[in-house]
Amino acid sequence: MEDIPRFANDYMAEDLELVKSGCIEVAARLNDLLDNILLVGGAVPALLIDHHQKLDIATDRSDPLSAHVGTRDLDLGLAVGVLNKRRYSEISTRLKESGFKPDENASGNQTTHRWKHCDAEKLTIDFLIAPVEKEETGGNIRNLESDFSAIVVPGLDLALEDPHPIQLSGTALDGSEMSIEIPVCGPGGFVLLKALACQKRGKDKDKYDLFYVLRNYEKGPERVAHSFRPFLERGAAEAEQAVDIMEEYFDDSNSRGPRAVSNFLYGHQDDTVEADAAAFVQAFLRAL
């Protein structure tokens, strides 16, 4: 049975380091295709904030509000442009050559939207793709090849418009040392995707990730709102839905969002954290 982390202390520093190595490996292998790829998901706060803003997460990981807990997964968002000229075929071929292959579920069947590395089996890559058509349902699987697919994620097309290049140095999965630029989801796109995820799935970590970015990105909620506002100005339905979700989930400190944050962090209610979570989200919403 898959070991799914539920609380902050389930995440280890070595998990994040492995994900960083995976980022470097994938970026090096797909370097000329990165204009159609964006790093999204739980690795974003650690790179966009902790790494890019030069926070020293190595010295103190005891405070999950000041140093992101990290992730075990590498989520790659694919633009619909990969469907042109069969770029998806080039992506899968290169990843296979570097040691990645489709994962298997508990029944032994391939999960073609999730791949793992032959030498680092704790690391998985989840492939996501923006909807090709507006009516395409989120969560559906878009098959690209017989052993390669991606989960349809509404709003990903918006996030792909605001990549933040992050220079990452370290050891790739093949053991080589390098420094390479990673296209990372911007704060506005990240909050949009996380807000939608809050409603779609019941993971407490989604609420924590959202709160962490609003609390720690540069000058805080107002700066994130500046990155998010263009989505609303163009009338993007996903952005409006994300706002509605945040208003509902973080209405006050007793709402489900703040409760989920404190439960993820400590396994119980914490009045201070819950008040902060509601306050930061409300400050973001007011700044819009």
Where in this protein do the model-derived segments appear?
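Compositionally biased terminal segments of proteins
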Residues: 1-288
